[in-house]
Amino acid sequence: MDRSGFGGMSSPVIRDAEVTRTARKHSAHKRVLIQANQEDNFGTATPRSQIIPRTPSSFRQPFVTPSSRSLLRHPDISYILGTEGRSPRHTQSSGYLGNLSMVTNLDDSNWAAAFSSQRLGLYTNTEHHSMTEDVNLSTVMLREDDPGEAASMSMFSDFLHSFLKHSSTTVFDLVEEYENICGSQVNILSKIVSRATPGLQKFSKTASMLWLLQQEMVTWRLLASLYRDRIQSSLEEENMFAIAGINASEKMVVETLFQRDSLVRQSQLVVDWLESIAKDEIGEFSDNIEFYAKSVYWENTLHSLKQRQLLSHMGSTRPLVTELDPDAPIRQKLPLDDLDREDEVRLLKYLFTLIRAGMTEEAQRLCKRCGQAWRAATLEGWKLYHDPNVNGGTELEPVEGNPYRRIWKISCWRMAEDELFNKYERAIYAALSGNLKQLLPVCDTWEDTVWAYFRVMVDSLVEQEIRTSVMTQDDSEELPREYMEANWTLEKVFEELQATDKKRVLEENQEHYHIVQKFLILGDVDGLMDEFSKWLSKSGSSLPGHLLRFMTHLILFLRTLGLQTKEEVSIEVLKTYIQLLISEKHTSLIAFYTCHLPQDLAVAQYALFLEGVTEFEQRHQCLELAKEADLDVATITKTVVENICKKDNGEFSHHDLAPSLDTGTTEEDRLKIDVIDWLVFDPAQRAEALRQGNAIMRKFLALKKHEAAKEVFVKIPQDSIAEIYNQWEEQGMESPLPAEDDNAIREHLCIRAYLEAHETFNEWFKHMNSAPQKPTLLSQATFTEKVAYEHREKKYEMDHNIWKGHLDALTADVKEKMYNVLLFVDGGWMVDVREDAEDDPERTHQMVLLRKLCLPMLCFLLHTILHSTGQYQECLQLADMVSSERHKLYLVFSKEELRKLLQKLRESSLMLLDQGLDPLGYEIQS
């Protein structure tokens, strides 16, 4: 549905500025002053935290004021209701039981001032920015590709900040703050849209965003109103059985009904809510009400009639009414002057719009100001009758309401049925009398239609109660039976709505927020969860981000109230929202939503998020946020490491026997190296860091990626082993370390010994192949060349001696380090000492395989060192070491490797024979 023109939710009246010829004629002389006086009697802005009844059908009044309510009996629960502990229904209104003095004093005061102050009530609790700030913000936003998205990005963090700031006992203050945040953004987006160039696609997106946020704002408003009342009702069960007295007046009967019947009360809250939405929009046309310069109605017709009297001899060009009483056009079936007819239509449209917004008093003021005090009086008859003097008393008190309200209502019903009247005039009196059939034709939007149904439902239920509880003297005339005997339910209203023939209403009925509003009104949480599930399965992550935010916070709100939400759906909503936050890089928000998932899912979800975090500082920040959110940080970091390690499905591969000792480090390897950072932030995780580091290094060693393994080793803090022992001692443990930790420490030392041996061999190998070159002398060398040769030879001998000395030192060092690996203490290299550890078949298999991969190769390298440095006899001693039953190194050699070792030992024996020694290196006895 095209939403490119959203300034807000439309009312049944076209609210563009309509200035008639009469208005234009007088506008040069006098304009309506629109004052911003919030102290005006009728100008008090509507607090966002409460929905105050503004409709003539608002039957709720003094019976629900705080002074007349019983004290709460469960203060521990009622704290949820906020500081006042009262539902919005406890507020006085201008409804059926309202303060008469506010309406009966129909003076000539400028009603427009009140109108303006109502406009100033829009988003009253939002943070007000200075004009300069707004201009600067709007200017910046206009440069964005999607100004609406850019302007509203802060809402994600704002909502979380508000959520964390409030406890479960101030949940309704939290909802009010949600509404205020939305209202603030609506103000900003409205300014952006108003300054935008028409037709640009990016601003149509902004308009759509504006509409979404407006819908969210009013949905939070509805939520607070309904659930505050529902909680209040659960605390005040005694009101369920309230019954009016025998001689109770209409007003008293209705008071009791509202106390007793939650359907009537909450239906009225829906009416109030819908009227508050319309009231927010009322300012769009309030500046253009300039019907008359004086309080004279039908002045053009009056002028024409006077002219005809003066020029009666000239005849009349067209028929006009000849009398100017209110009933004249209908009675005479003659028209007014064209200008007056135009003004009359506009006036009636404005009046209906005011009635739709619950501003009956303002509608009466407008009538009086336009010279139609009689019409203002017709809007007065809905007030419920009450005579406080019936019960006696020393002082005579004024009578309230209309004793002939029933006759007035029947007259309104008949007027609404009369097709001779304008459709908006009929709709006005249809709204006052509960005539749904005549009210619906002017209701073009979802909000207007729902308002019509609920207003009529409340009106009908109240009227039924009055008819059964109040003694009447004259029953000769009754309202239609279908009205008086209607069996209204909330479900029936929405069934009727689904069956409407208005295409726009049907389309709006399928919009996300209207579906949410429907289920909130019905109080059907399970149905709402089912809808959420459908949306996720159909659209998933393509749902608007702000809608996902709303869905998430709505679920959290319902959970706070102790209401059951379907676990599977709630989890999917949270997971989808978390994925949105990840994709939009709201990294600081993710932990606090993840903690609302079940623990195993929370660990998996947050670990998945952390896999994509690569910067060291950001990693540290994410872990700190996880701690604040009470997530299991240790399990999460362990899971991150395991997840990344599992991405490599490569198997352990056997080393070839080439002298090349290292394979290049890939990007995948780099991820595994860096993942260890997750485990070193917290000293309490050093044992886990050791275990995971060992697992990664085992893979690297098997693939001859010694440099990569070395980088992992460096990631582990040097004091890790000492830290593990210290933490164990701090716990007051006198027993040895857990077997898993003990074995991990030993494995870590094994890997360190192996890496040190390889690093030293690399140095030896490099030095061995960088021997100084002996100079040569040409046979026909000159004397000068011979002298130069002698200098080069002396330098060579000096360099060779230095090289030889360094080589001997490196040889001794590398021999020691290699023997440390081959003859590793307490059972051998990569062999666990503690056998009481938890069984880990994969680790055991890898360690056995590493012995078979690394020890034979290291033995061959040691032979190369010894053979290259002329230590042939020691070469032969390798056979004793390999065959030793103490170390059992022969078990890690394959037949091919043993054959190759024997071949190398044979070469060393031949060198000994060339030196005149026996094959084992001993002198030959003569």
Curated annotation (Swiss-Prot):
The modification Omega-N-methylarginine is found at residues 60, 69. It comes from Mus musculus (Mouse). It is found in: Nucleus membrane; Nucleus, Nuclear pore complex; Chromosome, Centromere, Kinetochore. Plays a role in the nuclear pore complex (NPC) assembly and/or maintenance. Required for the assembly of peripheral proteins into the NPC. May anchor NUP62 to the NPC. Involved in nephrogenesis. Keywords: Acetylation, Centromere, Chromosome, Kinetochore, Membrane, Methylation, mRNA transport, Nuclear pore complex, Nucleus, Phosphoprotein, Protein transport, Translocation, Transport. GO terms for molecular function: structural constituent of nuclear pore. It comes from the Eukaryota. Pfam families: Nup84_Nup100. Part of the nuclear pore complex (NPC). Forms part of the Nup160 subcomplex in the nuclear pore which is composed of NUP160, NUP133, NUP107 and Nup96; this complex plays a role in RNA export and in tethering Nup98 and NUP153 to the nucleus. Does not interact with TPR. Interacts with ZNF106. One of its GO terms (biological process) is nephron development. The modification Phosphothreonine is found at residues 46, 55, 65. GO terms for cellular component: kinetochore; nuclear envelope; nuclear membrane; nuclear periphery; nuclear pore; nuclear pore outer ring. The modification Asymmetric dimethylarginine is found at residue 60. The modification N-acetylmethionine is found at residue 1. Its main location: nucleus. The modification Phosphoserine is found at residues 4, 10-11, 57-58, 70, 87. This is Nuclear pore complex protein Nup107. Belongs to the nucleoporin Nup84/Nup107 family.
